[in-house]
Amino acid sequence: MLFHVEMTVNLPSDMDAERAARLKSDEKAMSQKLQQEGVWRHLWRIAGRYANISVFDVESPAHLHDVLSQLPLFPYMDVEVRALCRHASSIHDDDR
């Protein structure tokens, strides 16, 4: 199942700089691992915001929740999820 996920990160302004840097580093490593596994199919920065738009390829809504809730920055995110389905006019064979 494909899901469009918009994630906005809101780190507390008083968060220790070292903790913030560690969280960001851990998040980057985890996101790259999920991309290599094909779970996190697309990742796009939203210009001018600490936010992204992503496409996840997971088994179920519960699987998506498990993936998102394990992200190091998840406690500091506002997340919007939309289920996707293949468009009849798409020319891409890998749209599922």
From Swiss-Prot:
InterPro entries, A to Z: Dimeric_a/b-barrel (IPR011008), MLI_dom (IPR026029), Muconolactone_d_Isoase (IPR003464)
Any one GO molecular-function label of the UniProt entry: muconolactone delta-isomerase activity
One Pfam family it belongs to: MIase
Ranges that cross the membrane: none
Pathway participation: Aromatic compound metabolism; beta-ketoadipate pathway; 5-oxo-4,5-dihydro-2-furylacetate from catechol: step 3/3
Reactions the enzyme catalyzes: (S)-muconolactone = (4,5-dihydro-5-oxofuran-2-yl)-acetate
GO biological process assignments: beta-ketoadipate pathway
The entry's keywords: Aromatic hydrocarbons catabolism, Isomerase
E.C. designation(s): 5.3.3.4
Subunit structure: Homodecamer.
NCBIfam families listed in its UniProt record: muco_delta
Family, as annotated: Belongs to the muconolactone Delta-isomerase family.
Name used for this protein in its record: Muconolactone Delta-isomerase 2
Gene encoding the protein: catC2
